[in-house]
C-alpha cells in the first residue's frame, strides 16, 4: 500500500528525518519532517495549467499550527483554530521569501504549499522544519522549482555561533538568525540581534549556509529515489522584432522619464510613454484582422524600464540623481501631537512615517497564545501602510501579511534597546503610520519609533537607525545602493535591510532574487549600510540626543514597590476588599505580582504617593517601643482596643490607660477617640500590648 522513502541526517544536536510516500499521497509532493519531537507535514500542489490572462505567479504558502499538536485546546469561546496567528503569518512569509525567486519566469500555474505542525516539541521551534519540508515537497513534486534549498537557525552564545539552538539557549543568545539558501548561495536572512558587529553577523550567516548543506544533500537523495518527473516549462519567448521596434521608438523617452527625480511626476511620465507604446503597437493587422498584443507590449515595456534603471545604476546614475552611497534628505520632528505620550514625524525623501508611543501598565500587555503556552509582551509595534501613502485607493481594514511582516522587522530592530521592566515598568505600544512611501518604510518606522520613544521619556539603551540597501548585478559588474527607492527595490536584485548603530547590528533582513551573491558583496553591503545608518543617526540627533527627563502630562505615572509575598493577601483583602478600597480612594490602578512586586499607576503624583502610603501602612510590622496614633475601635471591661495600623489592633489594658487607678475604661477613652499609644510588647501570636501611661508622662514633662 505504501512506498515509503526516508532520509535522515544529523542537524545540530538532533537528527532531522524526511519521509515521503505514507501521508498525503494525492498531493504533487508531500514530506513528513521530524526534528526532535516536532513533526511537520508539508504538501505542495500546482495546477496543471495557468489561468487565461494570468500575468503573475500565484504562489501561496500557508504555515499552520494545530493546538492538538502540543496537547492543548484553543482558548476562548471557539474551540478550534480560526484565522492565522501572527506567528503563522510570519513563518509563512519566512518560507515564501526564499522559494519564490526559484521558480522560472513564465511559470504562472497556481501553486500552493501547506505546512502543518502535527507534533510540537517545545525545545525546538518548528519553523525550520517547515522551511526544509517545503523545499523537499516542491523538489519531489516535479514542478519547475530550481531548488532544493536548506535552512537553519543560528544563535550566538559565549562568542560562538550555535546551530539550531533550543528555546532555552535562544533566551541566552545575542542572536536569533534564520538563513535559507541553495547549494551555492544564500537567498534569505532574517534576524534579531543584540549589537553584533558586521563581521560577526557575516560569519554567522556563512556558518548557517555551510551547516545546512547536508540537508540539501538529503533532499537531493530523496528526490532521486522518489521524485516525480519534472514538468517541462517552455522558456519565455521574447519577440525580438517587437522589442527592437519599441526600443527604437520609446527607449529614449523611458530614459528621459527615469531622469525625473520626483516619484509621482516620474510615474506619470512613464505612464504616458507606456500609453503611447500601447496605442502605437498594442494592436496589429494580421490577414486583414486586428489582433491585440497589449499584454506582450506591456511585458516588453517593463523590460525596457528595468534595463534603463539597471544600466544607469551600473554607470553610477540613480533615478533621483544621487550617488550610490548618498542618503536622501532627512527631516525629523518630535512632539507633533499634543495629547499623545510620544510622537515623531520622520521624513526621508519621499518616505514618511508618523510614529507614536503610548505608555500603559501591565494590564495593557499583549497576551499571546501559542503552542508552547501563553506569554505576555510588554513591547509591541503596529505598522500600517494605507493606500493613500502611495497615491492609490485600496483596501482598508485588518493588517495584511506585508504589514505584519514589516511591523515585526521593526520590532526586532528595536528589541535590543527597550529598557527592562525593572528600569522602566511600563508597557510600550508603538505605532507607525506610513503617510508617504517611496522605499524603505520599515526602516523609516525604526527611526521614527526611536525618536518617539525618546520624546515619550523612555530611557532607551541607545538610539538606532535603519537603512535599506539594494544591488544591481550584471555578470561580474555590480553596484550596491544605499537607501533605495521603491523602483530600485522592485527592479533590483537584492533587498537588504539593516538596523543598528556604531556599536553593532540589531536587525538584518535580506532577500536575494538572483544567484551568485558572494561574501564579498554582502560584506560591502554591510559596511556601506553602517556608514549610512551612522549618517541617519546624526540627522536624528539634531531633533533629540537623549530621552526627555519628564514624561507627558497625559502619560500614567507608575510607582514600583516591593512587599513580602506573605503580605500580599493583606493588601488584597478578603474578596479583594482592601485593594478595591485603595483604588476607589486614590483613583490608582494597582497590579500585584506573585513575587510581591506592586505597580501603582496614576495620572498624578499625589494620588500615587497616597496609595504607596496606604500600602506601606498595611504591610508595616508593629515594632516594640514604637509610638503610634490610633483610633479606639472597641471598649471592653478590661481595656480598649486601638487600631494602630490597617488591619492591626492592639490592647491598652485598663491598668495602662493612665497614671492613676481607673475604675471604668470609659472614664478615660471612648470609642472613636484618637489617642497616642506606645507598643509595650508583641507576643508570639502577634497580639499587641499598648500603653498610654508613658505618653501621659511624656506630655507632663
Swiss-Prot record:
It is an enzyme of class 2 (transferase). InterPro entries: ExoRNase_PH_dom1, ExoRNase_PH_dom2, ExoRNase_PH_dom2_sf, KH_dom, KH_dom_type_1, KH_dom_type_1_sf, NA-bd_OB-fold, PNPase. Mg(2+) binds at residues 489, 495. Residues 625-693 form the S1 motif domain. Belongs to the polyribonucleotide nucleotidyltransferase family. It is found in: Cytoplasm. It catalyses: RNA(n+1) + phosphate = RNA(n) + a ribonucleoside 5'-diphosphate. Involved in mRNA degradation. Catalyzes the phosphorolysis of single-stranded polyribonucleotides processively in the 3'- to 5'-direction. Residues 556-615 form the KH domain. The lineage of its organism: Bacteria, Pseudomonadati, Pseudomonadota, Alphaproteobacteria, Magnetococcales. Its main location: cytoplasm. Pfam families: KH_1, PNPase, RNase_PH, RNase_PH_C, S1. GO terms for cellular component: cytosol. Its EC number is 2.7.7.8. Keywords: Cytoplasm, Magnesium, Metal-binding, Nucleotidyltransferase, RNA-binding, Transferase. Its cofactor is Mg(2+). GO terms for biological process: mRNA catabolic process; RNA processing. It comes from the Bacteria. This is Polyribonucleotide nucleotidyltransferase. HAMAP family: PNPase. It comes from Magnetococcus marinus (strain ATCC BAA-1437 / JCM 17883 / MC-1). One of its GO terms (molecular function) is polyribonucleotide nucleotidyltransferase activity. SUPFAM superfamilies: Eukaryotic type KH-domain (KH-domain type I), Nucleic acid-binding proteins, Polynucleotide phosphorylase/guanosine pentaphosphate synthase (PNPase/GPSI), domain 3, Ribonuclease PH domain 2-like, Ribosomal protein S5 domain 2-like.
Amino acid at each position: 500500500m505504501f512506498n515509503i522513502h526516508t532520509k535522515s541526517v544529523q542537524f545540530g544536536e538532533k537528527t532531522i528525518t524526511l519521509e515521503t510516500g505514507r501521508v498525503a499521497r494525492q498531493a504533487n509532493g508531500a514530506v513528513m519532517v521530524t526534528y526532535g519531537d516536532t513533526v511537520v507535514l508539508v504538501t505542495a500542489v500546482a495546477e496543471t495549467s495557468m489561468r487565461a490572462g494570468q500575468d503573475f505567479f500565484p504562489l501561496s504558502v500557508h504555515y499552520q499550527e494545530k493546538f492538538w499538536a502540543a496537547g492543548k485546546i484553543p482558548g476562548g469561546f471557539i474551540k478550534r483554530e480560526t484565522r492565522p496567528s501572527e506567528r503563522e503569518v510570519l513563518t509563512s512569509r519566512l518560507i515564501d521569501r526564499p522559494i519564490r525567486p526559484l521558480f522560472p519566469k513564465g511559470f504562472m500555474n497556481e501553486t500552493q504549499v501547506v505546512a502543518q505542525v502535527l507534533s510540537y516539541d517545545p525545545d525546538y521551534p518548528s519553523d525550520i522544519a517547515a522551511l526544509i519540508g517545503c523545499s523537499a515537497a516542491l523538489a519531489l513534486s516535479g514542478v519547475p522549482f530550481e531548488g532544493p534549498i536548506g535552512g537553519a537557525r543560528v544563535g550566538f552564545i559565549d562568542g560562538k555561533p550555535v546551530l539550531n539552538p533550543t528555546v532555552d539557549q535562544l533566551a541566552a543568545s545575542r542572536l536569533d538568525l534564520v538563513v535559507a539558501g541553495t547549494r551555492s548561495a544564500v537567498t534569505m536572512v532574517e534576524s534579531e540581534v543584540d549589537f553584533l558587529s558586521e563581521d560577526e553577523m557575516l560569519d554567522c550567516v556563512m556558518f548557517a549556509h555551510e551547516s545546512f548543506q547536508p540537508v540539501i544533500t538529503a533532499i537531493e537523495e530523496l528526490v532521486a529515489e522518489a521524485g516525480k518527473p519534472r514538468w517541462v516549462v517552455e522558456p519565455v519567448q521574447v519577440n525580438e522584432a517587437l522589442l527592437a521596434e519599441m526600443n527604437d521608438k520609446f527607449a529614449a523617452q523611458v530614459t528621459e522619464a527615469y531622469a525625473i527625480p520626483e516619484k509621482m511626476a516620474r510615474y506619470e511620465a512613464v505612464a504616458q510613454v507606456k500609453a503611447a507604446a500601447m496605442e502605437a503597437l498594442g494592436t496589429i493587422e494580421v490577414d486583414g484582422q486586428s489582433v491585440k498584443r497589449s499584454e506582450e507590449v506591456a511585458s516588453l515595456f517593463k523590460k525596457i524600464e528595468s534595463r534603463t534603471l539597471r544600466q544607469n545604476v551600473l554607470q553610477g546614475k540613480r533615478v533621483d540623481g544621487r550617488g550610490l552611497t548618498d542618503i536622501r534628505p532627512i527631516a525629523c520632528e518630535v512632539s507633533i501631537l499634543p495629547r499623545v505620550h510620544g510622537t515623531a514625524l520622520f521624513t526621508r525623501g519621499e518616505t514618511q512615517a508618523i510614529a507614536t508611543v503610548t505608555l500603559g501598565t501591565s494590564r495593557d500587555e499583549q497576551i499571546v497564545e501559542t503552542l508552547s503556552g501563553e506569554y505576555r509582551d510588554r513591547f509591541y509595534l503596529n505598522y500600517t501602510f494605507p493606500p493613500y501613502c502611495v497615491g492609490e485607493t485600496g483596501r482598508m481594514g485588518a493588517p495584511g501579511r506585508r504589514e505584519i511582516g514589516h511591523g515585526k522587522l521593526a520590532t526586532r530592530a528595536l528589541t535590543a534597546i527597550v529598557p527592562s521592566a525593572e528600569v522602566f515598568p511600563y508597557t510600550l505600544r508603538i505605532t507607525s503610520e506610513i503617510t508617504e512611501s517611496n522605499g524603505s518604510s520599515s526602516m523609516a518606522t525604526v527611526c521614527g519609533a526611536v525618536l518617539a520613544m525618546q520624546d515619550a521619556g523612555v530611557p532607551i539603551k541607545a538610539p538606532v537607525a535603519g537603512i535599506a540597501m539594494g544591488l544591481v548585478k550584471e555578470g561580474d559588474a555590480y553596484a550596491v545602493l544605499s537607501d533605495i527607492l521603491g523602483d530600485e527595490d522592485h527592479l533590483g536584485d537584492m533587498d537588504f535591510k539593516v538596523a543598528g548603530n556604531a556599536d553593532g547590528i540589531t536587525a538584518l533582513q535580506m532577500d536575494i532574487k538572483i544567484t551568485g551573491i558572494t561574501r564579498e558583496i554582502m560584506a560591502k553591503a554591510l559596511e556601506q549600510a553602517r556608514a549610512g545608518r551612522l549618517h541617519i543617526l546624526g540627522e536624528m540627533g539634531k531633533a533629540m540626543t537623549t530621552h526627555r527627563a519628564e514624561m507627558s502630562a497625559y502619560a500614567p505615572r507608575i510607582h514600583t514597590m516591593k512587599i513580602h509575598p506573605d503580605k500580599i493577601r493583606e493588601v488584597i483583602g478578603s474578596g479583594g476588599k482592601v485593594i478595591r478600597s485603595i483604588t476607589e480612594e486614590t483613583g490608582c490602578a494597582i497590579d500585584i505580582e506573585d513575587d510581591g512586586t506592586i505597580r501603582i499607576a496614576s495620572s498624578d503624583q499625589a494620588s500615587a504617593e497616597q496609595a504607596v502610603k496606604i500600602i506601606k501602612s498595611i504591610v508595616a510590622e508593629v515594632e516594640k517601643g514604637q509610638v503610634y496614633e490610633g483610633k479606639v475601635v472597641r471598649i471592653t471591661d478590661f481595656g480598649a482596643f486601638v487600631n494602630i495600623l490597617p488591619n492591626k489592633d492592639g490592647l491598652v489594658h485598663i491598668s495602662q490607660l493612665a497614671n492613676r487607678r481607673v475604675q471604668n475604661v470609659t472614664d478615660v477613652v471612648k470609642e472613636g477617640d484618637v489617642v497616642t499609644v506606645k507598643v509595650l510588647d508583641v507576643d508570639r501570636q502577634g497580639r499587641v500590648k499598648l500603653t498610654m501611661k508613658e505618653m501621659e508622662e511624656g506630655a507632663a514633662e
